[in-house]
Amino acid sequence: IAFGSQALVKDLVTGFFVLLENVINVDDWVILGGHDGQVENLTLRHVAVRDIYGNLHTVPWSSVETITNQTRSFGYAVVEVGFAYRENVDEVISVVQQVAKEMRQEPELDEGILRDLQILGLIELGDSSVVVRTRFKTLPFMRWRLERDFRRRIKNRFDELGIEIPYPHQTIYFGENKQGTSSPARVLLEKRLDPEANPPGDESDS
């Protein structure tokens, strides 16, 4: 009973200050108690959060240590653009900026963008790609839509211009002997059978 009373008091005290300080509101998108979703209900004892799969999580305030409000005031749509080492970095950045400008020509998207695209720089020289990080400052709930739309447009534009987007692949290296030559590779080729032909051993049509 004492333990239950202690948890109840903690729920009420924490809930009181969360509501008093307006940390989160109904409809905000938050991360708390190990859950990521939209706030559907707030009480002094708990908060109800619905995730993207429709699951409703009821979280007592006593189990919440940190609250991350992802939709307070503004958001950042952050997109990392990867491309092959053979591509010119400045040219790729120019293409990305042009795509961003075209997005701002569409009123439905432009109204959600608070600041022009920022190029945050080259952040990674990976195993197979060069990565540039970009971001828009957006209205709170527009960040995810803009990220999706920006990625789609970049992919389509890269395809049009022949800019390579690398993907994981492996190069097989057979090694060399002391003479500097490699051992021959034995490759077994299988003949593709005509699907209309009879399987081996089937002489029904003969």
Question: Model regions: which residues?
Answer:
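Intrinsically disordered, low-complexity regions of eukaryotic proteins
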Residues: 13, 53, 204-205
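Short, structured secondary-structure boundary patches
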Residues: 9, 61-62, 81-83, 184-192
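Residue-level signature of catalytic and energy-coupling elements of molecular machines
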Residues: 9, 27, 39, 92, ...
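Soluble accessory domains appended to multi-pass membrane transport proteins
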Residues: 16-114, 124-126, 130
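Hydrophobic side chains in well-ordered alpha-helices
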Residues: 9-12, 60, 92-95, 146, ...
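Solvent-exposed, non-transmembrane regulatory segments of membrane-associated proteins
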Residues: 1-4, 87, 97, 106-206
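Membrane-spanning helices that line or support transport/gating and their immediate boundary helices
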Residues: 4-19
